[in-house]
Amino acid sequence: MTLDDRIRNAAGPEPVFDPVMRDFLSNCADELRQRQRPGSLLDAADLGTSASWLWRLTFSTLGIARDDNDKLVSAARHTVGVRFLPDYLRRADRFEMLLLMEPEKPFHPNLRGQHVCLEVYPGEPLVEICEALHSLFSWRLRQLSEADALDAEACAWGRAHLDALPLDPRPLFGRTLELTLEPVEVGA
């Protein structure tokens, strides 16, 4: 089963959306497509059929995971399924919306298994959710208290390694920089 099929199965059938929500989803999709360009750390795939309600977001953001021996290793790929429900403009539940597909064993205070603890507000655009996920995976955004963390050990690790954070300082969306070089005449 492909990753996209696993996300579709976890999300369930495509809901019915009212015209306002359809327009919101369409605007979110357009905004995300406009922001993506070569050099972006995000590959986004719209998995919806009649509305852009389900996404596979694959980040090339550097983070940390555990290997098969529970040793901490660098993770350069994070994949999240994002699901928008019909009442999203009024209510947002991060555990209904976000599903971490990769890495299998993440190491972060806000991640445990497939669960992602990230504040998502009703009506928050997809681009902002992508930026927040990138900040989370790079350890720029993290839970500081073990009592509130999904992974208390990762929380303690983060506090002990503050000087090494964030792990990935690169921006999520590549930026185009146009330079024009002209010869310089010496002694003129």
Can you describe what each PLM-predicted range is?
Residues M1-R77, D87-A188:
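UBC/E2-like fold recognition across ubiquitin and ubiquitin-like conjugation systems
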